Amino acid sequence: MKRSRTEVGRWRMQRQASRRKSRWLEGQSRRNMRIHSIRKCILNKQRNSLLFAIYNI
């Protein structure tokens, strides 16, 4: 069964749009992950420095 050109075009547009949206969402989550990891790193550094400060006294 052959699809009309407009139908195929519409499908292609929809698929591109959904792919773009999912890729954007993925990018957002990745960005958030990076922020979280940086924050975690900073917290760990603070914790470690506190430990060493206590032990050095």
From Swiss-Prot:
Q: What InterPro entries does this protein's entry cite?
A: YciY (IPR049586)
Q: Where is this region: Disordered?
A: 1-25
Q: Where is the composition biased (Basic and acidic residues)?
A: 1-10
Q: Which domain of life is it from?
A: Bacteria
Q: Which family does it belong to?
A: Belongs to the YciY family.
What's the protein name?
Uncharacterized protein YciY
**Naturally occurring in which organism (per UniProt):** Escherichia coli O1:K1 / APEC
The primary gene name is: yciY
